[in-house]
From Swiss-Prot:
PANTHER family: 40S RIBOSOMAL PROTEIN S3A. Signal peptide: none annotated. This is Small ribosomal subunit protein eS1. It comes from Fusarium vanettenii (strain ATCC MYA-4622 / CBS 123669 / FGSC 9596 / NRRL 45880 / 77-13-4). GO terms for cellular component: cytosolic small ribosomal subunit. GO terms for biological process: translation. It comes from the Eukaryota. Component of the small ribosomal subunit. Mature ribosomes consist of a small (40S) and a large (60S) subunit. The 40S subunit contains about 33 different proteins and 1 molecule of RNA (18S). The 60S subunit contains about 49 different proteins and 3 molecules of RNA (25S, 5.8S and 5S). Belongs to the eukaryotic ribosomal protein eS1 family.
Length: 256
């Protein structure tokens, strides 16, 4: 008889479950902080695998992009249709310091703006800010009825559309190229550029629902920690105290 392993006897018991390890035990929570132009600084929390060996948690967090509603950042429901993208640039302890990375409209808001009997005019401009951020801004506008107009439709002629688009690009170029990214963000929140376009194009054709619907960050300058700390209200350098001048008094030791 051949001597060998009895396969039937060496088989393990069926139905034994493999021990499962909860993946959240290997992760840590980090707070996401919004930069200066926004009213609410605490955006939320994010998870990352704990630092083990050569894998650093900070490196895994840097470059992460989070999308937040502008209504949550400003505590104003009127901004609910706009989404802000923030990029994690630095990690300080358990805090992720972010910078502005883009802006977009919700799809339902965009679809609600498009209607019959009016002309849609779009324009986009690629511009560099004073702090060397290369961004592309997309603008959208719609024609509206003139005062005392009887006609149902509000279609603009091709020459009027070209003139309005030229005006839009000029205003966006002027407003965006003369300020830093932080100052531009401050202009985008209250729709300063949209109102300026609406006011300046009244002579060509009256417009409504003029918005910067999208902002895309194409290129960033070299990372500056001091500038990021200033955005988050923190100084990159240690505070030095003032010199205190006092009269020197020689201490006399008592004789023992």
């Amino acid at each position: 008889m051949a001597v060998g392993k009895n396969k039937r006897l060496s088989k393990g018991k069926k139905g034994l479950k493999k021990k499962t390890v909860d993946p959240f035990t290997r992760k840590d929570w980090y707070s996401i902080k919004a930069p200066n132009p926004f009213n609410v600084r605490d955006v939320g929390k994010t998870l990352v695998n704990r630092t083990t060996g050569l894998k650093n948690a900070n490196d895994a967090l840097k470059g992460r992009i989070v999308e937040v509603s502008l209504a949550d950042l400003q505590k104003d429901e009127d901004h609910a249709f706009r989404k802000v993208r923030l990029r994690v640039d630095e990690v300080q302890g358990k805090n992720c310091l972010t910078n502005f990375h883009g802006l977009d409209f919700t799809s339902d808001k965009l679809r609600s703006l498009v209607r019959k009997w009016q002309t849609l005019i779009e324009a986009n401009v690629t511009v560099k800010t004073t702090d060397d951020y290369l961004i592309r801004l997309f603008a959208i506008a719609f024609t509206k009825r003139r005062p005392n107009q009887i006609k149902k439709t509000t279609y603009a002629a091709s020459s009027q559309i070209r003139a309005i688009r030229r005006k839009m690009t000029d205003i966006i170029q002027r407003e965006a190229s003369s300020c830093t990214l932080t100052q531009l963000t401050s202009k985008l929140i209250p729709e300063v550029i949209g109102r300026e376009i609406e006011k300046s194009t009244q002579g060509i054709y009256p417009l409504q629902n003029v918005h910067i619907r999208k902002v895309k960050l194409l290129k960033s300058p070299k990372f500056d920690l001091g500038a990021l700390m200033a955005l988050h209200g923190e100084s990159g350098t240690d505070d030095q105290g003032q010199k205190v001048e006092r009269e020197f008094k020689e201490r006399v030791l008592e004789e023992v």
